[in-house]
Regions:
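Transmembrane alpha-helices
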Residues: 1-29
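Membrane-interface loop-to-helix entry segments
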Residues: 2-10, 99-117, 169-182, 285-303, ...
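Interfacial segments of alpha-helical transmembrane regions
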Residues: 29-45, 141-148, 204-229, 314-321
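Membrane-interface helix-loop-helix junctions at transmembrane boundaries of multi-pass membrane enzymes
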Residues: 31, 120-146, 305-321
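Membrane-interfacial, low-structure loops and terminal tails that flank and connect transmembrane helices
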Residues: 31, 126-142, 195-213, 369-394
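Interfacial helix-loop-helix junctions of multi-pass membrane proteins
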Residues: 52-62, 150-176, 233-245, 329-353
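Extracytosolic (periplasmic/ER-lumenal) interhelical loops and adjacent juxtamembrane/interface segments
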Residues: 55-102, 240-283
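Membrane-interfacial alpha-helical segments at the cytosolic side of multi-pass membrane proteins
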Residues: 109-126, 181-194, 296-309, 356-367
Length: 394
C-alpha cells in the first residue's frame, strides 16, 4: 500500500507540475493570485468530473483505496479488472470505469499539491513580512490557506471512505458538500487576492443599502448549502426519477411520501436502517423536498440578484448568478422529462458549482462595498467636523 501511495503521489506531482509551471513562468503581476485562480478552475473541473464519476457508476471502478487492486494505475491492474468484469459483467468494475475513478483520484491529489504550494508560499510571505506594519502583514495571513489544507485532507479522507464504505449515501453526500465548500473557500481567497492588488474604490450604495444586499447574499448562500445537501442526497440515493413530471409528482402536488426512511442518514445504499429495501415513497420524499426547496432558493437568490444588479460594482456577478439560476431550473426540469440523460445531469451538477462560485463572489464583493461605504461616510464626517472647526471664529 505504501509503495502504491508513493507511486500515486509521484503521478499527482507530475500532474500538478503543468499548472505550477504555467503560473510561475507567466508574466502576471501576482503569480500567487494566478495560482489561486488556477486552483479554483481545476477544483471546479474536479467537481464536474466527480459528478461524471458518480453518474456513470464509476465510484467503485476500483473497489480499494488508494490504488486500483493494489496497483497505482489500471494498466498495472488490467488482469484483475478483466477478471472482475468477467465474474460480474453488469457490475461496477470495468476498465473504463476504473480509469474514470483513477483519473478522478489523480486530479484530486494534484489539487492537494497546488494547495500545499499555496500554503507554503503564504507562510513564507508571512514570515518575510514580520518587519512590515501590522495592517500590511495581515495581507499575508496564512489562515485561509491553512484551512484549505485541512479541508482538502478531510475531503481526501471522505473520498477514501466513499470507496471503502461502498457508496454509503451519507458519506458520498458529505464528500460532495466538502468539495463545494472547498470551492467556496478557494473563490473567497481568490477574491481576497484580487482585492489586495486592485482594491474597490467605486462606491455604489449607502451602508444601509449594502447591508441589505449582504443579508440577502448571506441568506442565499445558506439556502444554497441546504439545497446542495438535498441535491447530493437525491443523487446518492438514485432518487432523480422518483418523480417523472413537473410540477406534479405521481399526478399529485403532494404525493404519498415516507420522510422517516427517506431522511434516515446512516444506512446502506437502497436499504432502510433496519436493512430492508428502501420503499419508493422514501425516494419520492427525497426528490420532492429537493425540487421544492430548489424553487425557494431560486426565488430568494433571484431576488438577491435583482437587487444586486442595481449596483454597478455588483452588476456583473448578479447577471451571471441570474443566468446560472435559469440554467439550473432548465436542466433540473430537463433531467426529469428527458429520462435523466448523462450530459444534462452533469450540466446540472456544474450549474450547482457555478452557483457556489457566483454567490461566494457576490458575498465578498458586497462585504467590500459595505466596508467602503462605511469608510467613505467616516471620512466625510471627519471632513465635515474639521470644516466646522475651521469656520468657528477665534
Amino acid at each position: 500500500m505504501h509503495l502504491t501511495l508513493a507511486q500515486m503521489a509521484v503521478t499527482a506531482l507530475l500532474v500538478a507540475l503543468l499548472p505550477l509551471t504555467l503560473v510561475w513562468t507567466s508574466s502576471d503581476v501576482s503569480k500567487y493570485r494566478k495560482l489561486v485562480w488556477v486552483t479554483v478552475f481545476l477544483t471546479f473541473d474536479l467537481i464536474v468530473f466527480g459528478a461524471f464519476t458518480r453518474l456513470t457508476d464509476s465510484g467503485l471502478g476500483c473497489p480499494d483505496w488508494p490504488g486500483c487492486y493494489g496497483a497505482a494505475n489500471p494498466f498495472l491492474a488490467h488482469e484483475e479488472i478483466v477478471a472482475a468484469e468477467a465474474l460480474m459483467p453488469t457490475g461496477p468494475v470495468t476498465v473504463f470505469k476504473a480509469w474514470i475513478e483513477m483519473i478522478h483520484r489523480y486530479l484530486a491529489m494534484a489539487i492537494g499539491v497546488l494547495i500545499v504550494a499555496m500554503l507554503a508560499q503564504a507562510w513564507y510571505q508571512w514570515r518575510r513580512s514580520a518587519a512590515t506594519p501590522a495592517g500590511r502583514r495581515a495581507d499575508y495571513a496564512p489562515l485561509i490557506p491553512t484551512l484549505l489544507f485541512f479541508a482538502v485532507c478531510l475531503q481526501g479522507a471522505f473520498g477514501a471512505w466513499t470507496v471503502t464504505l461502498k457508496l454509503q449515501p451519507v458519506i458520498v453526500s458529505t464528500h460532495l458538500l466538502l468539495g463545494m465548500g472547498l470551492l467556496a473557500l478557494l473563490v473567497w481567497y481568490g477574491c481576497r487576492q484580487d482585492q489586495l492588488i486592485t482594491p474597490a474604490r467605486t462606491l455604489t450604495a449607502s451602508p444601509p443599502a449594502m447591508r441589505r444586499i449582504r443579508w440577502l447574499a448571506g441568506l442565499s448562500a445558506a439556502l444554497l448549502l441546504v439545497q446542495l445537501a438535498l441535491g447530493g442526497w437525491t443523487s446518492t440515493n438514485y432518487a432523480t426519477l422518483a418523480c417523472t413530471e413537473f410540477p406534479l409528482c405521481g399526478g399529485e402536488l403532494v404525493p404519498p411520501m415516507d420522510f422517516e426512511h427517506g431522511f434516515t442518514l446512516w444506512r446502506e445504499l437502497g436499504k432502510t436502517a433496519a436493512g430492508h429495501y428502501l420503499p419508493f415513497s422514501a425516494l419520492t420524499a427525497i426528490h420532492w423536498v429537493h425540487r421544492n426547496f430548489g424553487l425557494l432558493l431560486a426565488m430568494v437568490a433571484g431576488y438577491t440578484a435583482w437587487r444586486a444588479w442595481q449596483h454597478a460594482a455588483l452588476q456583473r456577478t448578479a447577471r451571471w448568478l441570474a443566468l446560472t439560476l435559469l440554467l439550473q431550473l432548465a436542466t433540473g426540469i430537463a433531467t426529469i422529462y428527458l429520462n435523466f440523460p448523462l450530459a444534462i445531469a452533469v450540466l446540472h451538477n456544474a450549474g450547482a458549482a457555478l452557483l457556489v462560485l457566483w454567490l461566494t463572489m457576490l458575498n465578498y464583493q458586497a462585504k467590500c462595498q459595505f466596508e467602503l461605504a462605511l469608510a467613505t461616510n467616516a471620512t466625510a464626517a471627519t471632513h465635515a467636523q474639521h470644516g466646522r472647526k475651521d469656520n468657528t471664529p477665534s
